Amino acid sequence: MNTGGRLIAGSHNRNEFVLINADESARIRSVQELSGQTCQICGDEIELTVSSELFVACNECAFPVCRPCYEYERREGNQACPQCKTRYKRIKGSPRVDGDDEEEEDIDDLEYEFDHGMDPEHAAEAALSSRLNTGRGGLDSAPPGSQIPLLTYCDEDADMYSDRHALIVPPSTGYGNRVYPAPFTDSSAPPQARSMVPQKDIAEYGYGSVAWKDRMEVWKRRQGEKLQVIKHEGGNNGRGSNDDDELDDPDMPMMDEGRQPLSRKLPIRSSRINPYRMLILCRLAILGLFFHYRILHPVNDAYGLWLTSVICEIWFAVSWILDQFPKWYPIERETYLDRLSLRYEKEGKPSGLAPVDVFVSTVDPLKEPPLITANTVLSILAVDYPVDKVACYVSDDGAAMLTFEALSDTAEFARKWVPFCKKFNIEPRAPEWYFSQKMDYLKNKVHPAFVRERRAMKRDYEEFKVKINALVATAQKVPEEGWTMQDGTPWPGNNVRDHPGMIQVFLGHSGVRDTDGNELPRLVYVSREKRPGFDHHKKAGAMNSLIRVSAVLSNAPYLLNVDCDHYINNSKAIRESMCFMMDPQSGKKVCYVQFPQRFDGIDRHDRYSNRNVVFFDINMKGLDGIQGPIYVGTGCVFRRQALYGFDAPKKKKPPGKTCNCWPKWCCLCCGLRKKSKTKAKDKKTNTKETSKQIHALENVDEGVIVPVSNVEKRSEATQLKLEKKFGQSPVFVASAVLQNGGVPRNASPACLLREAIQVISCGYEDKTEWGKEIGWIYGSVTEDILTGFKMHCHGWRSVYCMPKRAAFKGSAPINLSDRLHQVLRWALGSVEIFLSRHCPIWYGYGGGLKWLERFSYINSVVYPWTSLPLIVYCSLPAVCLLTGKFIVPEISNYAGILFMLMFISIAVTGILEMQWGGVGIDDWWRNEQFWVIGGASSHLFALFQGLLKVLAGVNTNFTVTSKAADDGAFSELYIFKWTTLLIPPTTLLIINIIGVIVGVSDAISNGYDSWGPLFGRLFFALWVIVHLYPFLKGMLGKQDKMPTIIVVWSILLASILTLLWVRVNPFVAKGGPVLEICGLNCGN
């Protein structure tokens, strides 16, 4: 590489090499090179400055631009050099513009046109001091154009360029392996610091902005005026006559469109959201008046009943506040896939889209059928994304040979399925759901071969299903000696709790291609090592193993996590997420993009609120307007660097106002102090930047060469620190500091596989920060909440993406017992987090977590505790009907109006939420019903099980929820297995029905006057019964009868409670009847 007498150095901000004029002679030559040149924008000759030097707009590449175009570019344009994309700095004599000395996040998107990875501050620092050694000795004396062969794992290659480096680990037997710079030729790596289309003149692009049309017309008019002057003076240099044609180039709008933001926020219309906010404030005021009345008007003859109801109502009010205020700023988002393609997919050039590693996790193939997992994998392999940018990793935590064989057959079928999907652009790309959808598949399909190929593909898929089902039938009968491979070798996973790690690459760089001869995405089977005596941390541990394996084998900068039963329903889902992740303006602080969960196979009425529409269409939109949605465990695209525990890019404070904006007396008072602070800050920044020179061969400071021994010492210390944080794999540590991902192309596959086996060993995480600060966080069965919470505490923000076509679809529990079991697991995880050090009530202060976001996390861990007041409150109607008492005294006109306003505000709040959230009343009502059902059953049991697990150490083991499409074989099993979950709500139903019968009977026997007080108690009891109605329907099931054991236990418990209440009656005054003098003399 010809350096032209200039020094090679590195920019840590852009991760690129630049040329620095190291001596005066070289600087003079570089200036002379510009002499006589014309501005590459307008064609004018570049003028001289007041010091008789040629005007240079960009100090990085010296691209010829005249001062008028430079000032116009800074004032009206994108403020960046057209060639190297470096932001123009203010030159003495030029006016200030908005954005001077501001943070990189606010700079126009041209500067980071190809920089789609994050640049965390201390990640660059780690890359400086530990991953790259600056080199010594013979390197200094090497000629500028010499190629320097360096080791790549196990072999050497001298054909790679020395001006592109990757982090390579040479073989070493000593402690503390060193990391040296080595050439890097990965074609998937995005080009750094170069023009998008070098062969085109810069004038063809114009000036891009959001309002393109207006600003383009102004620019063309001004350019036309300049060209007329040039023509008149004869100074067009042969270019002037063609500029108008270039300005009218039809490709110009396309190129400018590619520079626009890739997404935008769509706030809820003010006509919908403002009344909603006003009503929330009114409801708060009504709530205050309500509690003022309730506290000041006790029920004297049933004081205990009144006090219990007030305590429950206060808890409900606090719970409502925690749930309501995170929905204060709901937003929606819109993506521009065409702009993403224009920006990163140039015709005739390699795709610039970032690679993505997809994680699929499964445990038990008998409860998570292999056919469902196979459909998920097929939908991933057929995704609309460059095949060399996608790698699918399937984690088999059960080490089942059934899963291994099914995945092998899936890889073979993918050779036919993937080209069929891409040829005809079908949706969805999971064959089971594509062939089962009821639609006219001939609609909009004009390809003459489509019908023929579709029928052939359906036959092939039916044969594939037969093979998978045959494997499942065979796996039902396990041999006594265990399974063996085809060559007679025992299957390593015969013992599920004691087996080595296993990795198998089915597709990818092994030479296997589809039927059309095209390359297929990589498909890797992973089963981590398990040994007795090690805590494997269930799903969270499996996901962390996938992070490390993928970092060694492919190291994509972004990760997609899906459950085995959630297939990709929208083939452009990954592109949708990249519109946020790769957006140069706002993408650098995004840690993950969460998609809503949508489900197949749910009945039309959705009696158990399986769709959870209120949460995904209302609550998550509200969180997206604050700091982003919480992570829900599937359908989420992560930034790898965020999972590594790095902090989000810090936002610098904007500079203070200049003297032109402040009064002169203020400048006299504050100018000196501000100047001194600025100097100190600049000195500190310069010192910090000097310590971050990643590719520097030597530090240059005023012509003095500083040896690099101190840098080496810091590198060794940082290397040890990184190994303590990430583990003892030098290859993984090297990959962890690569911000844009990638692995060395010439690395030996055998070496990579050996390293991958090491990082999934059961003892790899010992004495590291895995599960504590890195990856999926341990400590709860709901690791998703903890993982997202830690990222938000590090200052990251997340994004909620709701494309018109659902990105992912999955299967939901189909019967009541499965649904309650699922809710039980979620609630248990929340209780574990509440009782841990990561509880959002006291953890994460001083970080980047916003207050309303903290409210949401607090609500997500506190809601199981609501089961206690909820069950008590649902029991009060029966108590009131049995005792003839009530929770409120005789209602006055004021109290009646207050209660009416309270109920109206609750109803109208729900209506307005449904309006701006796009939720139907059926979904909203089912959500309200299941809140009571889940609170009275699963949440209560989760609360006690969580307390036993955390405080007493009694562990509760759960089985995976069945994902089978047919529930006939499992329905009865689950009903009898989870009997205890059904008893509390059944008991509430029975005692309230008994209370209604007793209350009505008492009113009939006591006459007309007793009907008035009875209405309030009946309304209270019927409110509970109506909310529990889906539970009653669910217990009847297909047999239209309730299991006998449930009926017996519930009636027995209800009878005991009723008799005990009649005997004790604690809410009635203990004294006898109050005798008063009536005023009549009865003795006479």
From Swiss-Prot:
Binding site for UDP-alpha-D-glucose: 361, 367-368, 397, 538
Annotated binding of Zn(2+) 2, by residue: 58, 61, 81, 84
Tissue: Strongly and ubiquitously expressed. Localized in some dividing and expanding cells, as well as in vascular tissues.
Enzyme class, broadest EC rank: transferase
Sites where a glycan is attached: 957
Record's bilayer topology term: Multi-pass membrane protein
Modification type N-acetylmethionine: residues: 1
Disulfide bond sites: none
Cofactor binding note: Binds 2 Zn(2+) ions per subunit.
Quaternary structure annotation from Swiss-Prot or TrEMBL: Homodimer. Interaction through zinc finger domain.
Record family assignment: Belongs to the glycosyltransferase 2 family. Plant cellulose synthase subfamily.
Name of protein: Cellulose synthase A catalytic subunit 2 [UDP-forming]
